[in-house]
Amino acid sequence: MMQDATDPAVRAALQSQPSGLNSTDDWRQVMDRIMSLTARNPDAFRQQPQANRLSAILEAVVPARANPTHEKVLAIVNALAENRAIRPDEAGLVYDALLQRVARYNSGNVQTNLDRLVGDVREAVAQRERAQQQGNLGSMVALNAFLSTQPANVPRGQEDYTNFVSALRLMVTETPQSEVYQSGPDYFFQTSRQGLQTVNLSQAFKNLQGLWGVRAPTGDRATVSSLLTPNSRLLLLLIAPFTDSGSVSRDTYLGHLLTLYREAIGQAHVDEHTFQEITSVSRALGQEDTGSLEATLNYLLTNRRQKIPSLHSLNSEEERILRYVQQSVSLNLMRDGVTPSVALDMTARNMEPGMYASNRPFINRLMDYLHRAAAVNPEYFTNAILNPHWLPPPGFYTGGFEVPEGNDGFLWDDIDDSVFSPQPQTLLELQQREQAEAALRKESFRRPSSLSDLGAAAPRSDASSPFPSLIGSFTSTRTTRPRLLGEEEYLNNSLLQPQREKNLPPAFPNNGIESLVDKMSRWKTYAQEHRDVPGPRPPTRRQRHDRQRGLVWEDDDSADDSSVLDLGGSGNPFAHLRPRLGRMF
């Protein structure tokens, strides 16, 4: 018997027996254990707190079950030590490791806690469902009570009536913040989802009682429409989203109304033709202003008012990045002589990764703006890079980049348009102008003998020239070219000719033909132009005198100022640099 008691398996089997009352227990033994608590000093036990007395009674009736796990583990460790599987000094370490593993993977407390957690979750879900359906349950009870007062069959449209009642049940069940209640003899449906709306179900069904299955004529629906009350129309509007084309027949009047309400509620997008329609109407009324039209459309379509754009500015970090980019790009441009686009790319490659990662949107926008500025207006790009106080324009922050266009430096950019504007002229003025032009052409063929004649000839052409300021500027400058006069070429240029009067008085019916003949008569062939050009004069020998020595010589090779400045190709332009050798006569 003692051997069975020392056996670990037997001990484990004994300790794993369930505690408490069973078939083998006797109620007399239980009563003896309870009475033994008060046998020694009944008054002392009676004077203890109620919780202590209740705990002692419960422990005496149902003793607590002892946990045999550590005893089993200890028996296993002892058996291992007796069989020399482990050394005695390793018994404590193995015992502790086994207890931890049993507590982790095979613990009754863990399994119990999991079971309790699953039960708690199920209870919470059940309570949530009951809480959510508590209002709908009351509404469904009230709705069933209302439907019990209504007839189950109708004379016409039985299928539509049944489907309508099913849609009503679905609306009461699925619509949040709604309820069905009874007030007096009538039943009401109330919803507060999009404003408080209440429908008297009793009065609505009484109004719809004779309209089930009614097919109104297509042309005249006013007679049937006058039978519906606003209360019934509101019920149809609320129940329309819960119906479809198959539930209620579209041929009936009620089905037609439900379809109209359903399509009106489901159409949430704006018609695409609205903008064109309002634009055409505004133009028909005479409102051609695009700005006011867009503002009106913006208010009509979106019901939004225009806001004043906010002022944008750079913070300290962004301004520091801007100055760094300016210095780096200017250094690349001046040191390496690269193009602006390449300089910007070099600056982007040399930028610190951390700074780029923290300011990626601003740096990308800045580089994009500078690339566009360099492509559209290089001068603006250069000024922006070299200006240490430059800040981006407002369009830089909004995304609408505005780069001023560059000035290409064309000559017509600086000429006043009023020079080419037509001026009213009479027939007498036209004849006087033509005579002056003819006289000026004749004078241009005569070569001036001196510079004084050249200077005197210029003022005569000022009166008839359409550019008196340009001619005056030519004559005011000092020049010694022998073929300086260009009045003939200037006057024969069709682009610089003064505009003639195209529409003369009605006395000249063939004015268009005469102007065409006049233009064709001024045309010259290449041979005529070559023949009309005056030939160059033979070079004259100039004599120089030396009054001190009495020497006179002819200068054949030396070139005066006029020959040096003559770019026509005659003479040696470097002859004045050669030593001067005289010849005595």
From Swiss-Prot:
Modified residues (Phosphoserine): S225, S310, S444, S449, S450, S452, S469, S473, S494, S515
Biased composition (Polar residues): 14-24, 462-475
Disordered as annotated region, ranges: 1-24, 438-475, 528-573
Annotated positions for site Cleavage: S570, G571
Modified residues (Phosphothreonine): T274
Keyword Membrane belongs to the record: no
Post-translational modification: Cleaved near the C-terminus by the viral protease during virion maturation to form the mature protein.
Places the protein is found: Virion; Host nucleus
Stated role: Structural component of the virion that acts as a cement protein on the capsid exterior which mediates the interactions between the hexons, including the peripentonal hexons, and reaches all the way to the penton vertices. Two hexon linking proteins IIIa, one from each facet, stabilize the unique edge interface between a pair of facets. As the virus enters the host cell, hexon linking proteins IIIa are shed concomitant with virion acidification in the endosome.
Subunit structure: Interacts with hexon proteins; this interaction tethers the peripentonal hexons to hexons situated in the facet. Interacts with the penton protein (via N-terminus). Interacts with packaging protein 3; this interaction is required to promote correct genome packaging.
Note: All late proteins expressed from the major late promoter are produced by alternative splicing and alternative polyadenylation of the same gene giving rise to non-overlapping ORFs. A leader sequence is present in the N-terminus of all these mRNAs and is recognized by the viral shutoff protein to provide expression although conventional translation via ribosome scanning from the cap has been shut off in the host cell.
UniProt name for this protein: Pre-hexon-linking protein IIIa
Organism expressing this protein natively: Human adenovirus C serotype 2
Lineage, highest ranks first: Viruses, Varidnaviria, Bamfordvirae, Preplasmiviricota, Tectiliviricetes
